[in-house]
């Protein structure tokens, strides 16, 4: 009887300690397609080939976006101080796989949820020949140009 109690106590302790495992603060959070809303424009995130998830690595909080344009503008509009350290995940337009947005390659002629037109690719090779390819920095710069041209807010 004493051995059985000791065994049960051991199982409870093992279960308790396994719940204390430290999680990766940059890891993707579960996405609730067609229910999560874009933090900036409040549209429902349903397009699985243009979605963006930003992780604040300081506290592990996740933010969903329907278009990379909303992400870039949100960082600026909300004056997000932790933006340089943020982990930015974006879905590859061809595979739907989550990739690092800062190292992705972007083509510029896509129909995207908010019409910014940038689609992410894990490699340059997956972009059709003849299409313009830009990196994260150039794409970000162009988002502000598009926004300034199309909207009255000046960036």
Where are these regions (language model features)?
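Short, flexible, mixed-charge glycine/proline-rich loop motifs
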Residues: 27-33
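Bacterial N-terminal signal peptides that target proteins for export
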Residues: 1-7
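Mature extracytoplasmic domains of secretory-pathway proteins
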Residues: 62-108
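C-terminal motif of bacterial Sec signal peptides marking the signal peptidase cleavage site
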Residues: 16-19
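Sec/Tat-exported extracytoplasmic proteins
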Residues: 42-45, 75-82, 143, 147
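Beta-strand-rich cores of mature extracytoplasmic or soluble domains
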Residues: 88-155
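Post-signal-peptide N-terminal segment of Sec-exported extracytoplasmic proteins
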Residues: 36-72
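Bacterial lipoprotein signal-peptidase II cleavage site
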Residues: 21-27
């Amino acid at each position: 009887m004493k051995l059985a109690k000791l065994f049960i106590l051991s199982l409870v302790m093992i279960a308790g300690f396994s719940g204390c495992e430290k999680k990766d603060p940059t890891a993707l959070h579960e996405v609730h397609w067609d229910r999560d809303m874009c933090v900036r424009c409040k549209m429902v995130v349903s397009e699985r080939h243009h979605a963006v998830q930003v992780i604040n690595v300081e506290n592990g909080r996740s933010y969903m976006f329907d278009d990379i344009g909303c992400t870039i503008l949100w960082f600026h509009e909300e004056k997000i101080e932790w933006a340089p350290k943020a982990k930015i995940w974006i879905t590859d337009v061809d595979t739907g796989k989550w990739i690092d947005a800062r190292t992705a390659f972007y083509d510029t002629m896509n129909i995207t949820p908010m019409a910014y037109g940038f689609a992410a690719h894990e490699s340059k090779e997956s972009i059709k020949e003849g299409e313009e390819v830009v990196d994260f920095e150039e794409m970000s710069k162009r988002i502000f140009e598009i926004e300034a041209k199309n909207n009255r807010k000046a960036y």
